A protein has these predicted regions:
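An acidic-aromatic loop/edge-strand motif
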Residues: 1-61, 88, 106-113, 120-191, ...
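Short beta-strands within extracellular/lumenal beta-sheet-rich domains
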Residues: 59-75, 115-118, 183-194, 220-225
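Solvent-exposed beta-strand/loop surfaces of large extracellular or lumenal domains
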Residues: 94-118, 206, 210-224
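Aromatic-lined ligand-binding clefts that engage carbohydrates, nucleic acids, or primary amines
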Residues: 73-98, 132, 191-216, 233-237
Length: 290
């Protein structure tokens, strides 16, 4: 792996002014809250936040009620470190198992500068169910989004997602089923091959692109030419971001387009269970020795 594994926190219980109000996927909760209060919805036709803030900043940021979100995740075996990633953390207060978190000391994410990454204090975590509580004074300005846990661990999806020890190896096949359902970085496979130089062609995979040494393959035929082997050939599949940033509940999982509406589907086009696409290299590459 070229980055840490990820667990997406996108389903929560929510409380308005201390009263339990429901449970569900975070973007659907955002819509439910806004509809119940007669507030404008976020979406493809919304007035952009910067415009609202510039021309109606007082009402845009006016607190309307206290909102609390409770996210649950399970730790089967304690890893050496877990970090929490949040977008616009300055708008929220965070508590892990009742212990406050200080995002003022968080680092900027290397994925997107809108994210801040905070290493959690491991003494605040327990093996078993852990609860992340997120509080805010809700206003039109507030954006409810997913939060992300990252670290050197495996992930198992379910009604409550769980963390378990990082798998020692990754085999050919769908990495979603191997403990990496939300992972979207690079995975390097070590391909056994006698010393020499090879053309390497991959015919069965799903990733953004492939690379080895300083060469990349982005279009068919997915062939990397004149790659050296010292006994193994490093072959990296750089995965897409779909299983990290969604849509994560839309049916079908693999869609040729992605618009704001795809994140808030309902009825037959929505499943509370995660709808993830298969990713990784599914079968050994074809090697042609030069």
């Amino acid at each position: 792996l070229d980055s840490e594994n990820i667990l997406v926190l996108d389903t929560a219980d929510y409380y308005i002014d201390g009263e339990y109000s429901g449970h569900g996927e975070i973007l659907h909760l955002d819509r439910d809250i806004r509809l119940s209060r007669g507030m404008p919805l976020r979406g493809g036709e919304m007035v952009q936040p910067w415009f609202k803030n510039k021309y109606n900043g007082r009402d845009f940021a006016k607190p309307l009620f206290k909102l609390a979100l409770l996210y649950r995740f399970q730790i089967d075996s304690m890893p050496n470190q877990i970090s929490l990633t949040a977008e616009s953390p300055e708008d929220f207060s965070f508590f892990i198992n009742g212990n406050p978190l200080d995002f003022s000391v968080a680092d900027e994410s290397d994925v997107d500068p809108c994210f801040k990454v905070l290493p959690l204090k491991m003494k605040d975590l327990v093996e078993g169910i852990n609860i992340l509580r997120v509080e805010c004074d809700f206003s039109d300005k507030i954006n409810l989004e997913c939060f992300y846990l990252s670290g050197n661990f495996g992930v198992r999806t379910g009604e409550v997602c769980s963390v378990f020890p990082l798998p020692e190896t990754i085999r050919f096949g769908d990495v979603v089923k191997q403990g990496f359902p939300f992972y979207s970085g690079g995975i390097t496979y070590l391909i056994p091959a006698p010393k020499g130089r090879y053309d390497v062609e991959v015919t069965d995979f799903y990733a953004e692109y492939l690379k080895s040494e300083q060469k990349i393959a982005t279009f068919a035929p997915f062939r990397l030419e004149n790659i050296p082997s010292d006994g193994t050939i490093p072959l990296t599949a750089v995965l897409t971001r779909k299983n990290t940033f969604g849509p994560l509940h839309e049916i079908p999982a693999k869609n040729k387009q992605c618009s704001p509406g795809d994140f808030i589907t309902g009825g037959e086009m929505y499943d509370s269970a995660y709808q993830l696409i298969e990713q990784g290299i599914f079968s050994p590459p074809v090697l042609k020795k030069l």
